[in-house]
C-alpha cells in the first residue's frame, strides 16, 4: 500500500496553483494526508535561482536553466518517495511534463533519471493565460509566441500519457467545476491505488515503495527493473 502522485499541468497562468492548493485543503478536510509541492520551490537554493532567472533578475543560458530545473525536480524525489511510503496524496504543481514541454520549446533534451511518472495527471488546457500580463510584467517563457509553442508541446506529450492516467480539462471552465472534477477523480485514484506497492519511474524502472525503510533511508536501493509490476488501472480516463 502506498500514497499517490498527482500532477497538475498546463502553461503559465491557467490556474494550476489555485487548483493544487484547493485540492490539498479539500483532501485534508476529508481526513486524507495530502501535501502540495510547487516547482520552482523558492525555499531551496536551486528553486530560488530558477525564480531569479524566470523573473529576469539573473541571466542564464537556456541549456543551463533546463538542467537546473531537472536537478530541482530530482532534489524532491527522496521526499516524494517518503511521502508515498507514508500514504500521502502528493500533489505537484509543474512536474515532469512541464519540464519536457518547456525544454522542447528551446530545442533541448533533458535528463529524466530519478523522476517518477505520475499516477494521474490533470492538464488544464488553454493556449493562453486566463489573464494575460502586461509585457513589462511577463516572466521568461510568458510571451504569447513561447506559450503557444509550449502548449503545442504539451498536447503532443499528453497524447503519449495513457488515457487511464489523464484528464484534460478546459482551463476556461468554472473554477468550482474544475475543482470538483479534480477532487472526485483524485479520491477515486487513491482508493483504487490502495493495493499497489510500486510506482513507475520515467526510465521505466520501478520504485518498490513497500520496501522503503524510513529509518535507514536510501530510496535508490529500492529501484527495480521493469518486471511485470502491478500498476494503477482505471478505465475512466477522460477528456472533456
UniProtKB/Swiss-Prot annotation:
Coiled coil: none
EC number: 2.7.4.9
Record flagged with keyword Nucleotide-binding: yes
Catalytic reaction equation(s): dTMP + ATP = dTDP + ADP
Keywords, ordered alphabetically: ATP-binding, Kinase, Nucleotide biosynthesis, Nucleotide-binding, Transferase
A family per Pfam: Thymidylate_kin
GO BP of this protein: dTDP biosynthetic process; dTTP biosynthetic process; dUDP biosynthetic process
Database matches in InterPro entries: P-loop_NTPase, Thymidylate_kin-like_dom
UniProt function note: Catalyzes the conversion of dTMP to dTDP.
Family note: Belongs to the thymidylate kinase family.
Name of the protein in its database record: Thymidylate kinase
Gene label: TMK
Amino acid at each position: 500500500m502506498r500514497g499517490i502522485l498527482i500532477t497538475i499541468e498546463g502553461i503559465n497562468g491557467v490556474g494550476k496553483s489555485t487548483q493544487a492548493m484547493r485540492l490539498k485543503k479539500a483532501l485534508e478536510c476529508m481526513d486524507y494526508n495530502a501535501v502540495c509541492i510547487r516547482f520552482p520551490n523558492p525555499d531551496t537554493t536551486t528553486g530560488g535561482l530558477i525564480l531569479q532567472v524566470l523573473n529576469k533578475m539573473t541571466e542564464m543560458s537556456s541549456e543551463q536553466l533546463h538542467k537546473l530545473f531537472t536537478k530541482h525536480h530530482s532534489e524532491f524525489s527522496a521526499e516524494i518517495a517518503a511521502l508515498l511510503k507514508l500514504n500521502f496524496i502528493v500533489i505537484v504543481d509543474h512536474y515532469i511534463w512541464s519540464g519536457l514541454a518547456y525544454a522542447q520549446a528551446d530545442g533541448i533534451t533533458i535528463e529524466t533519471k530519478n523522476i517518477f511518472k505520475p499516477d494521474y495527471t490533470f492538464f488544464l488546457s488553454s493556449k493562453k493565460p486566463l489573464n494575460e500580463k502586461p509585457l513589462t510584467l511577463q516572466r521568461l517563457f510568458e510571451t504569447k509566441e513561447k506559450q503557444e509553442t509550449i502548449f503545442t508541446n504539451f498536447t503532443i506529450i499528453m497524447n503519449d500519457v495513457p488515457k487511464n492516467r489523464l484528464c484534460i480539462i478546459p482551463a476556461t471552465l468554472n473554477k468550482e467545476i474544475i475543482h470538483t472534477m479534480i477532487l472526485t477523480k483524485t479520491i477515486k485514484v487513491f482508493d483504487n491505488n490502495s493495493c499497489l506497492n510500486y510506482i513507475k519511474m520515467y526510465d521505466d524502472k520501478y520504485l518498490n515503495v513497500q520496501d522503503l525503510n524510513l529509518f535507514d533511508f536510501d530510496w535508490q536501493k529500492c529501484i527495480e527493473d521493469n518486471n511485470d509490476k502491478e500498476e494503477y488501472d482505471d478505465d475512466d480516463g477522460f477528456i472533456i
